[in-house]
A protein has these predicted regions:
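Conserved acetyl-CoA-binding loop-helix of GNAT-fold acetyltransferases
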Residues: 78-81, 87-104, 120-124, 230-243
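Structured C-terminal portions of repeat-based eukaryotic scaffold domains
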Residues: 205-257, 264
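A conserved beta-strand-loop-helix scaffold within acyl/acetyltransferase catalytic domains
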Residues: 6, 10-82, 180-220, 224-228
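A short, well-structured alpha-helix characteristic of acyl/acetyltransferase catalytic modules
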Residues: 2-5, 15-26, 144-153, 162-175, ...
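Amide-forming acyltransferase catalytic core, primarily the GNAT-like/NAT-type
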Residues: 23, 125-221
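Conserved GNAT acetyl-CoA-binding A-motif
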Residues: 74, 101-115, 246-258
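Active-site/acyl-donor-binding loops of N-acyltransferases
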Residues: 113-114, 120, 125-147, 250-310
Length: 310
């Protein structure tokens, strides 16, 4: 017997508070280790954070964030329902609205990072499992000091990420991911977060590497990490970790599994596999060139930014 979907309304959030009042309790319930400030970041970037209101409710009971980037790529995130409203067809209503928006934007690539339990759900919706994104974690340097030392004969000069024109941050990101995330790298968004900072590498006037980190409930989340060489990736990660030398809590990062050196790098600095990997899935198996085997992403993206945005 098929149950009827309750009457409902799907619409974009009116303001940040409307999203955050649903987002924050769900993040705590699911243990996704995302900060309140992350919600503000994604809301600022997205023009259509979708919420669903069952007829009997004055507050939203589910959400879905479709991120539509300027280069006709899209990312699907935060597809979540409150427990009492799961299994009633409301998620399908949210999904249809997302598909309408993505179709209207004529997106060529649509991706998402799925938790293992949801892979079959997305497979039925036409997504193909194309890569893994292992979650890595590390105890603080207070609890577990760095046990490795090396010379810096080949070290390069690092610059504060905020001193680099967002146009160049966007371009380096695009070259590694195929996603045009200029709205994230705008001066008033990621670079402006008070709970975050990062470093870049500029060689011969060209931006070749960057690392970014932000606070999360359990400690600090690192990513993205792009670098032209393993040595430079190690220098960026080592520097950033040392800047959090007195931090309590843990480090977290999402590793781009297609880069075989990514996990090795983090393990060299004392990180461990957290026991779970996201499944990077693409609609109809269409993967941006920048993330395929042998691409710049496969050799230079050591950590992704966030499962919520690619």
């Amino acid at each position: 017997m098929t149950l009827a979907t309750p009457n409902h309304i799907v619409r974009p959030a009116k303001d940040l508070d409307e999203v955050q009042d649903l987002y924050w309790p769900l993040m705590q319930e699911l243990g996704w280790n995302r900060a309140k400030e992350d919600c503000k970041t994604h809301y600022t970037v997205s023009k259509s954070w979708l919420l669903i209101f069952p007829e009997s409710c004055k507050t939203p009971q589910g959400m879905l964030l479709p991120l539509i980037y300027p280069n006709k790529t899209a990312w699907v995130a935060f597809f979540i329902m409150n427990a009492a409203y799961r299994g009633k067809g409301l998620g399908a209503a949210l999904w249809r609205e997302m598909e309408t928006l993505v179709s209207a934007a004529q997106c060529s690539f649509i991706g998402l990072d799925a938790v293992p339990e949801q892979v079959q759900t997305y497979t039925r919706r036409g997504f193909v499992d194309c890569a893994r994104v292992p979650l890595m974690s590390r105890k603080s340097l207070v609890e577990k000091p760095l046990g490795i030392k090396w010379g810096y004969e080949d070290a390069v000069e690092l610059q504060d990420l905020r001193d680099v024109d967002p146009v160049y941050l966007t371009q380096l990101d695009l070259e590694h991911t195929g996603l045009d995330r200029r709205a994230y790298w705008a001066a008033n968004v990621l670079p402006a977060r008070r709970d975050a900072f990062g470093y870049t590498i500029v060689e011969d006037g060209e931006l070749t590497g960057l690392i970014y980190a932000r606070r999360c409930p359990d400690g600090v989340r690192i990513g993205p990490l792009f670098a032209a060489t393993y040595a430079q990736a190690r220098q960026l990660l080592h520097k950033l970790m040392n800047d959090y030398a007195r931090m309590e809590g843990t480090f977290a990062a999402e590793i781009f599994g297609t880069n075989t050196e990514g996990r090795k790098l983090f393990e060299e600095l004392g990180w461990e596999y957290a026991g779970v990997s996201y499944h990077r899935m693409w609609k109809d198996g269409k993967v941006p060139e920048e993330q395929k085997e042998g691409s710049m992403g496969a050799t230079g993206m050591y950590a992704t930014f966030d499962a919520a945005s690619g």
